[in-house]
A protein has these predicted regions:
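Ligand-binding beta-strand-loop-alpha-helix segment within the catalytic cores
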Residues: 74
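His/Asp/Glu-enriched, well-ordered alpha-helical/loop segment
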Residues: 12-22, 29-52, 56-57, 62-66, ...
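Extracellular/periplasmic ectodomains of large secreted or surface enzymes and adhesion receptors
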Residues: 219-221
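Active-site gating/metal-coordination segments in enzymes
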Residues: 1-6, 57
Length: 221
């Protein structure tokens, strides 16, 4: 582990040089350390739109989420980890109170903290709709509904793999939504996510993609 003072020194150097910072945080201990770091960076060199992001976001407290909102932080989360790990973490390692509350995305949505999803491949599958399904349903691999109040709306889930994902990386003017002047890069689904059962979101088939305006149907491969 890098000593805290060294981390702060490096972070301050990149912060002052204009880089966007991304930090891996899996527990509330690392989240607390990152919150402290953001406060230091903002005190030394205030930035209204820094978009410092927490990557993974496995476990935080409600109070920490409120602090992230106040500090202007953003989140790149992996809700798949709740799907695959919540049960075993609850039973064997963290206890039900923490295991059930993994990846508190509902809290972020209520607070208005911007968030996106990532796969963390090869640790988890490259399946954006699986991430949406995990966040919207919060049903574990064993079929248990845990942390129901941390579910997110379908709209928030879809934004997390499109425009919000682009925004977190600073590419919202190029990709992430269909608009004149942006790159025509998007995926075409065979069913409307808003018209299927939430439990079926992960099963929606992919027709193909459009890359820079050129359609590429999967059937052609």
């Amino acid at each position: 582990m890098v000593p805290e003072d060294v981390t702060t020194q490096w972070a301050q150097a990149f912060w002052d040089a204009g880089y966007q910072l991304h930090a891996h945080t899996n527990g509330d201990g690392s989240a607390a350390r990152l919150i402290k770091l953001i406060k230091t960076l903002q005190a030394n060199t205030p930035k209204p739109d820094h978009r410092l992001s927490l990557e993974h976001f496995a476990y935080t407290t409600e109070d920490q989420n409120r602090q992230l909102k106040e500090l202007g932080a953003v989140v790149s989360a992996n809700p798949y980890y709740h799907f695959i790990l919540s049960d075993i973490y609850s039973e064997q390692w963290l206890g039900a109170d923490r295991g059930n509350q993994m990846v508190r995305l509902g809290s972020l949505e209520r607070l208005g903290v911007p968030f996106a999803f990532h796969s963390d491949s090869p640790m988890a599958p490259l399946e954006p709709l699986t991430l949406v399904s995990a966040a919207v349903n919060r049903v574990t691999i064993n079929g248990n509904l845990t942390g129901e109040h941390e579910r997110v709306s379908l709209d928030a889930g879809l934004r997390a793999i499109t425009i919000n994902a682009a925004w977190v990386m600073g590419y919202e003017d190029e990709i992430g939504s269909i608009r004149a002047g942006k790159k025509a890069d998007f995926t075409i689904l065979e069913a409307d996510p808003y018209k299927v059962s939430p439990k079926r979101i992960k099963d929606i088939k992919i027709w193909g993609t459009v890359f820079e305006g050129t359609p590429a149907p999967l059937s052609a491969n």
